[in-house]
Each structure stands twice: as C-alpha cells, then as structure tokens.
C-alpha cells in the first residue's frame, strides 16, 4: 500500500491501481514526494497519474521530478503538511509532442540506468576500501 510516503506503509492483498502509476504523496513528512511504480499498487493518501495514450508516463514522471522542490514548497498545513491536486494546478509543465516526450523519457531512463550501475560500483568500491582498511590498519596485512 502506498500511503503518503517514500516507502509502502504496509502491504495490501489487492490493488486499486493497475499498470504503471505515478504517485504524489498527499500528507505527512513526505507530502509531495513523487514516485513511479511499475507494478499494481493499492494507492491511498496520494494523487495518482496512470498511463494514457495522450502522454508518456515516464515523461510526466521526469517533469514532476524536475519540479520536486516546487511541489514541496506548495505544501499547506502546519504540523501535518498536505499536498492536494489543486495545490499542483499553479505549477506549469511543458508538454512537447508525444514522440518527443517518449524520446526525452528514453534518454533520461537510460541515464538513470547508467547512474544505477555507477552507484553499484561505488558501493562495491566502498566495501572493498573498508575491507582493505580493516586489513591494513589492524596489521593483518603488511605492505613492507
């Protein structure tokens, strides 16, 4: 269940959104957080955008990510911040032709893939460094 947060609040036996879905969390500390789900979800306490033939969902997702800080600034409420669909209305988005939306989304998705590979490599390198530090700084492995 997606309930206004960066992580699923809990799991639900059924879904109310099928196919790919963009969510914008509606309340709480993560109000305004934008996410894309590729599997069926049970969405609650969030605005959702589903796939359509009139726009590229990945493009919409990247548009929203690009405006993430603006969306956060649109929060209302005090101790319990909220973002409602009407709060997003003043935020301007540009939509080129569908083929261009698709091309832009493909480039950005490919870059995300490259970044994920680099992030994995970075984590592996960090783990290797930690292991080397343990070996070298404890004296188990000597260099001279």
What are these regions (language model features)?
Residues 33, 81-82, 121, 129:
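Long, compositionally biased, intrinsically disordered segments
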Residues 56, 80, 100, 104:
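Hydrophobic (often cysteine-bearing) scaffold residues that line and stabilize catalytic clefts
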Residues 3-65, 72, 76-77, 84, ...:
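A short beta-sheet element
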Residues 94-144:
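Amphipathic alpha-helical coiled-coil/heptad-repeat segments
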Residues 67-70, 111:
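Generic non-transmembrane alpha-helical segments
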């Amino acid at each position: 269940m997606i309930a206004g947060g960066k992580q699923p609040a809990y799991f639900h036996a059924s879904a109310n959104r099928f196919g790919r879905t963009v969510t914008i969390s509606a309340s709480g500390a993560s109000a305004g957080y934008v996410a894309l789900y590729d599997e069926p979800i049970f969405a609650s306490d969030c605005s959702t955008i589903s796939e359509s033939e009139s726009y590229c969902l990945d493009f919409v997702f990247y548009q929203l990510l690009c405006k993430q800080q603006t969306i956060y600034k649109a929060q209302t409420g005090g101790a319990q911040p909220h973002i409602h669909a009407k709060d997003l209305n003043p935020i301007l988005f540009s939509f080129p032709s569908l083929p261009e939306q698709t091309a832009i989304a493909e480039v950005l998705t490919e870059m995300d893939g490259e970044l994920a590979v680099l992030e994995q490599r970075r984590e592996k390198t960090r783990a290797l460094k930690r292991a080397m530090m343990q070996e070298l700084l404890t004296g188990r492995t000597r260099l001279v």
